[in-house]
């Protein structure tokens, strides 16, 4: 089985989940991305070739030229809309018997193929058990409302997201948040940070470090933060509809 995810953060999260769930079953799960050291990469590629690694999770690297599979039965493409056409073509032609693509906001071409019967389509319309519906409020920016929302989430031992449309908005919003809620720990993540720093910030936040994650829409790609139940989107009119839909999925 090969699972491809668009970001290294998502790869790391999938790795932790798969390893915890398949640990007792004796299934070997390995990772393959730009964060893998040369030695790790070499060992994983060798394991895939001889069959000792049964599941590999990575970015587009799982379809690399040097990667060969002993008996590839299933390719899973998570957040399919985040991959380019060339990347998806490579993933689909890896020789797997089955290909499963996952998306909360499918691109028109994929949706069209499913509707005309070229691809089988399954819709997951039932939320997980005990999952509460998302309440969405549209209002003008109100400092007191922001403070109340963030402190309320902290009081229930939860975490919050604050999302801005542009990297240029980060510094100003960070200053506002520090003035509004000086008692909260604020972490930041945006696309111009080094990849290792983005990974560290987002994985640490998902692990419970920090009260607020101030970020651009970089967080839309499937990051699972169980304790995060509040999101404030500043200047929501500058986001696309699919982006807002993906962002809502983070809480």
Predicted regions: what they are:
Residues 1-251:
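Inter-lobe coupling/hinge segments of SF2-like helicase ATPases
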């Amino acid at each position: 089985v090969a699972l491809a995810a668009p970001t290294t953060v998502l790869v790391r999260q999938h790795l932790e989940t798969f390893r915890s769930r398949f640990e007792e079953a004796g299934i070997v799960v390995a990772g393959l991305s730009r964060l893998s050291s040369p030695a790790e990469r070499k060992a994983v590629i060798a394991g895939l070739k001889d069959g000792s690694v049964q599941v590999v999770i990575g970015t587009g690297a799982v379809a690399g030229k040097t990667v060969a599979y002993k008996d590839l039965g299933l390719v899973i493409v998570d957040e399919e809309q985040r991959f380019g056409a060339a990347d998806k073509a490579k993933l689909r032609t890896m020789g797997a018997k089955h290909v499963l693509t996952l998306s909360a906001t499918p691109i028109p071409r994929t949706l069209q193929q499913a509707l005309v019967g070229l691809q089988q389509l399954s819709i997951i319309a039932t939320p997980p058990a005990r999952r509460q519906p998302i309440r969405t409020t549209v209002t003008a920016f109100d400092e007191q409302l922001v403070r109340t929302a963030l402190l309320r989430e902290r009081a229930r031992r939860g975490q919050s997201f604050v999302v801005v449309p542009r990297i240029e908005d980060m510094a100003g919003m960070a200053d506002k948040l520090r003035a509004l809620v000086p008692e909260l720990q604020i972490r930041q993540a945006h696309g111009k940070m080094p990849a290792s720093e983005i990974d560290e910030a987002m994985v640490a936040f998902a692990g419970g470090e920090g009260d607020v994650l101030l970020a651009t829409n970089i967080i839309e790609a499937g990051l699972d933060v169980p304790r995060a139940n509040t999101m404030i989107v500043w200047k929501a009119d500058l986001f696309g509809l699919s982006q807002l839909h993906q962002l809502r999925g983070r809480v």
